[in-house]
């Protein structure tokens, strides 16, 4: 059912194995590829439900909302594996890498973030071992910059519904697949919130993020200047 595997336990309940889309794409060509990026199922723009406890061993493990990006590596590459999420204008919204984040804080001459890219800030590391991998993007922009690597880039605003691309790069090889982030159908049915409303909300959130990043950078540079004086 919609690339999910649904199992019935003879009247006692249903179990669903989520998103088997890669199995529907298997072919001799895919199996013989050194690297392959699978199609991405269109995700819904949903907020994760709050959990007050971990599920028990017999309880279902519900996936968090987001886009699942599946890719295959026939062997572990020697260089970087990079995944970029692009919007309809071709701008990089989020970037993920197999390389470890640099622990050193690099300051620019400017007191403002300026053209600094937050797209890769605070992102989890991409796996690059041989085999199949499923990576989950939470549909969020990067959050505000922080001098702490553990906090930098976290909890950013969710992206606007619309068309996006996932671009996987390994060395000189790259592949792009398109997908659409869909509006929460419950919100669409109510009709009280439009895409234009969401766009305005996200723009304001990004403006606040950038202002907070500028403020934190200014404080960090003042601390650096004081330490070197």
Positions of predicted regions on the chain:
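Repeat-solenoid scaffold signature
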Residues: 1-29, 72-74, 80
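Extracytoplasmic/secretory ectodomains and luminal regions
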Residues: 27-229
